[in-house]
């Protein structure tokens, strides 16, 4: 699965970084391809381009604040989870992304 992980936190440092690293590790340990974007405060400089977001199978958003430029995810399956819950339940969050991927991949095969 190609996974884009977006973390957003008010300060954009501690929680975003910790959450992004843990989610990325869990997903790559399971064999998934992962791209990560961290947003927070005024940090919008490392945003992934729309092309990368559109090539993902699932967009995973761990948030404490609203995510900027959500139009990049249009038409993609999105899993949203509060960042504090994501940090405490890393495996379950990746499980959910895999579940959503399985549902969308299954519907594409049927259609």
Please place each PLM-identified region on the residue numbering:
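N-terminal beta-loop-helix "entrance" segment that forms/cooperates
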Residues: 28-56
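Short, polar loop motifs at secondary-structure junctions
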Residues: 63-68
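A short, flexible N-terminal coil/short beta segment enriched in small residues
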Residues: 1-23
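Short, solvent-exposed amphipathic alpha-helical segments in soluble enzyme
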Residues: 19-24, 77, 96
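Ser/Thr/Gly-rich flexible loops in soluble cytosolic domains mediating phosphotransfer, phosphorylation
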Residues: 3-4, 78-111
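Short, well-ordered alpha-helix to beta-strand connector turns
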Residues: 56, 75-76
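Glycine/threonine-rich flexible loop motifs
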Residues: 70-73
